[in-house]
A protein has these predicted regions:
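Interaction-mediating elements
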Residues: 2-3, 20-317
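Sec-dependent signal peptide recognition
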Residues: 3-10
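C-terminal motif of bacterial Sec signal peptides marking the signal peptidase cleavage site
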Residues: 15-18
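Flexible glycine-/small-residue-rich
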Residues: 39-41, 148-152, 163, 233-237, ...
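Strand-connecting loop/turn motifs
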Residues: 126, 208, 350, 382-384, ...
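C-terminal outer-membrane beta-barrel translocator/porin domains of Gram-negative envelope proteins
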Residues: 276-280, 360-364, 476-659, 669-701
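Gram-negative/organellar outer-membrane beta-barrel architecture
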Residues: 284-285, 304-538, 622-623, 629, ...
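One-face residue pattern on beta-strands with alternating periodicity enriched for small/polar residues
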Residues: 370-376, 412-416, 442, 516-522, ...
Length: 770
């Protein structure tokens, strides 16, 4: 570490000099450093949520000061470092554009901010609030100080709704007990806006298609004294006749093969009348019964927003249309209370072909590429089905380490057929959810050739269902999941050598039938960008051999088999919880907890290789090569023929601080911790202690003492449609070392070539690690 002290100090000095915030200021210019709000400074009275109100007020001031990361104004530093470019192009000009010009105190408009902050306080119920502003200058830096005198916060004394003088006001009063305006609550303008929206939503459900929240007024009387207000809800006199009467649906016209070019021709067609639908399509693109599942409206019923939104969502999510447009038109120019519903659907192309090439560089020193071709056929049986046929092949070679020059080949072929409905034997479900449920069948073959070690063949077939409960929750259930896994070896000597050094591999890599079911659940609110805290959760349960084990007999060895292949029996559960906390717009603290547990029983002594848990790698504990960490305190030998180490139990924790550097470049600082374990210690074969994996068994009291810990930094290029990342990590805790020696901070030596070769792990990946 001492060898790096001088270079680091020099680099730090250059950084401080470049980031000097006042370096480029001209004489008389003052750098604006931000705003501070003081609430009732001359009074001992405290207001509710003072800290939150203070933060909200400071956030509303303009302009914003120059951005900073951990207190350092990097963008201003880039601007200062660039200076005045002498050429219209070039590096200095580019650097200046990526930076930020200094925000000056002269840019602050005190009166404007006074008015904005006062208005905000009034909207929060401080009807007598007043804000005044001033500036403070120290050397070349200045800030704005705003003093807010709030007065008392007003409460609601009484709420009055319009009298029942007509159908509209009667319908408003029907749900007045659901009002958001509660006697005793504080005055809050956002609540009043939401109350208007609530009334509008209620009316939209009973036919008031043309009504709008703008036709409601909420009058506030603050003259009654004692810091109280009376609230009166009224319908504006200017509300048009169309807005104050309910409408029913007369005709439902569907154009399933619509285009602007064919618009006039389609309207001249004689429609196919099916149930309540008039279908205009002389090409019979879709079967009419498809629209029973997509369109929730019926002739003669009152318009309601729920059916409107559910119909729209289903048509968008069915995966058959590139454009969906829904139009409600008044019949006979508003002379009656009826609407015609016109649905214009533009189908996606029947067939499409996608081709992709990806490069890989893994933390176990394998580099290579993969080619994938996917053929998609839509609307296969004219019911919006989708058939996906894909073929992919990949090649990897190890560039360094004890397995230098080892190659890995992979080939995958998969067919997947998706039906936009639930297909359940002996039952016809009727789903009214906005998100259309799907039945998915798939069949795949995968071959993985690990050079001179082994070749893994896997055939898998599944039948199951996918359905979204709402925009946050998604379920996948495969009641039938059948896999056949077979392993071949170059010769018997290779096989015997593998099993001799690791007897547990015999049960792991033997030919197996996996017949079972699986279910997984996903919850996420990541689509809500306005949230400060976003959460993602994934939970999975998988079983194998449970039911089939009851119907298969045992062979001479006491094994239950299907076609003379052992039936695998196990239970496997996994949970993945992630939290993303936005400290600022460009600074996010991401955390993950990953847990896994597998239990083999009955016919099986260990989990199948494809169902085991692994640790290490670019999306795991990044300071350790992929699949080489654990189990427990065991360390695989450097000369091991088979380095992959699987386990029955997994615990992993990741914490990552993500920040924007400039433009599309983002940085990250991270810490990873985790390990895998076997449920029981692997003692090897009797009389062969060299085959044992000592320390591999799970003991609850030793869990945290046996965690591996790594840390590092990353650079990410985020261009919206994909993210390319480079992470470099190194271990700070090695669980396979003797107790008391596992923390290795004192061994860190970036100046040592040997230390870097043995400890630095580079990970290149597509997308974020979690």
């Amino acid at each position: 570490m001492k060898k790096l002290t001088r270079p680091l100090l020099f680099l730090l000095a250059c950084l401080v000099w470049a980031c000097s915030s006042t370096k480029s200021l001209k004489p008389g210019q003052i750098l604006y450093t931000g705003a501070e709000v003081k609430i009732n400074p001359d009074s001992s009275g405290k207001i509710d949520n003072e800290k939150q109100i203070k933060n909200d007020l400071e956030a509303k001031t303009r302009p914003r000061p120059n951005s900073s990361i951990l207190g350092i104004k990097f963008k201003l530093g880039l601007y200062n470092l660039a200076g005045e470019p002498k050429k219209p192009k070039g590096f200095r000009n580019w650097l200046r554009k990526k930076g930020e010009a200094p925000v000056l105190l002269n840019d602050v408009k005190l009166k404007y901010n006074n008015d904005v902050l006062t208005s905000y306080l009034i909207s929060e119920g401080y009807l007598q609030a007043n804000v005044t502003g001033d500036t403070i200058v120290k050397e070349k830096k200045g800030k704005a100080i705003y003093t807010a005198v709030t007065g008392q916060r007003y409460k609601i004394n009484k709420v009055t709704f319009p009298p029942d003088t007509g159908i509209l006001t009667k319908n408003i009063n029907v749900n007045k007990d659901k009002t958001l305006l509660k006697v005793g609550d504080f005055y809050d303008i956002d609540t009043y806006k939401n109350e208007r929206i609530r009334i509008d939503n209620d009316l939209k459900e009973i036919g008031y298609f043309y009504f709008s929240p703008d036709y409601l007024i909420i009058q506030v009387d603050s003259t009654i004294g004692k810091n109280l207000v009376n609230i009166k809800v009224k319908v504006k006199d200017i509300a048009p006749d169309a807005a104050i009467k309910p409408y029913t649906v007369k005709n439902i016209n569907i154009y399933p093969n619509y285009s602007l070019r064919r618009d006039s021709a389609l309207r001249k067609l004689n429609p196919l009348v099916y149930n309540d639908f008039n279908i205009y399509d002389n090409r019979n693109t879709f079967k009419p019964k498809l629209f029973d599942r997509l369109v929730f409206f019926q002739k003669g019923e009152a318009y309601n927003r729920k059916d409107h939104n559910q119909s729209l969502n289903r048509m968008v999510n069915v995966g058959a249309f590139q454009d969906v447009r829904v139009e409600f038109l008044p019949v006979d120019s508003f002379r009656n209370n009826q609407l015609d519903l016109n649905i214009y659907l533009t189908p996606l192309k029947k067939n499409s072909l996608t081709f992709s090439v990806t490069g890989t560089s893994k933390s176990n020193n394998f580099v290579g590429s993969e080619v994938k071709v996917t053929q998609t056929t839509r609307n296969l049986f004219r019911n919006a089905e989708q058939l996906d046929l894909s073929v992919s092949g990949g090649f990897e070679t190890q560039t360094k380490g004890t397995s230098l020059g080892k190659n890995s080949l992979s080939f995958t072929a998969e067919g997947k057929l998706t039906f936009p409905r639930l297909i359940v034997p002996f039952y016809k479900p009727n789903s009214t959810n906005a998100f259309i449920p799907k039945t998915i069948t798939s069949l795949s073959y995968q071959m993985l050739n690990r050079g001179s070690e082994y070749t893994l063949h896997a055939i898998k077939g599944e039948y199951g269902y996918n359905f979204k409960e709402n925009q946050y929750k998604e379920h996948n259930f495969n009641p039938i999941s059948i896999s056949y896994v077979a392993t071949s070896f170059p010769d018997t000597n290779t096989r015997d050598s593998l099993f001799k050094n690791n007897p547990l591999l015999r049960s792991t890599l033997e030919n197996q039938f996996i017949v079972g079911s699986n279910y997984n659940f996903t919850y996420t609110n990541q689509m809500e960008d306005s949230r400060r805290n976003n959460v993602y959760f994934y939970g999975a349960l998988e079983t194998g051999g449970n039911v089939w084990g009851l119907f298969t007999s045992k062979n001479n060895e006491g094994k239950r088999t299907i076609f003379n292949v052992p039936l695998t029996q196990f239970i496997r559960v996994e949970a993945d919880l992630r939290d993303y906390y936005k400290i600022t717009k460009n600074l996010i603290w991401a955390n993950r907890l990953n847990l896994g547990y597998g239990y083999a029983y009955g016919n099986s002594s260990s989990l199948p290789f494809v169902k085991q848990f692994f640790a290490g790698g670019s999306n795991d504990v990044r300071a350790f090569p992929a699949r080489t960490l654990g189990p427990g305190t065991y360390k695989v030998r450097d000369d091991a023929i088979f380095a992959d180490q699987g386990g029955d139990i997994k615990l992993m924790l990741n914490s990552e601080l993500r920040f924007k550097i400039v433009s599309i470049f983002y940085g990250a600082l991270f810490v990873d911790a985790g390990n895998i374990w076997l449920r029981k210690e692997d003692l090897g074969e009797p009389g062969k202690p060299e085959t044992a994996r000592l320390g591999s068994g799970f003991r609850l009291k030793n869990t945290f003492n046996e965690l591996a810990v790594g840390t590092g930094a990353g650079l990410r290029v985020d261009v919206s449609i994909f993210v390319v990342r480079l992470d470099v990590a190194f271990p700070v805790r090695k669980p396979y070392l003797p107790e008391g020696q596992r923390w290795v901070f004192n061994d860190i030596n970036f100046g040592s070539k040997d230390w870097r070769r043995q400890n630095l792990i580079f990970n290149i990946g597509i997308g974020y690690p979690f």
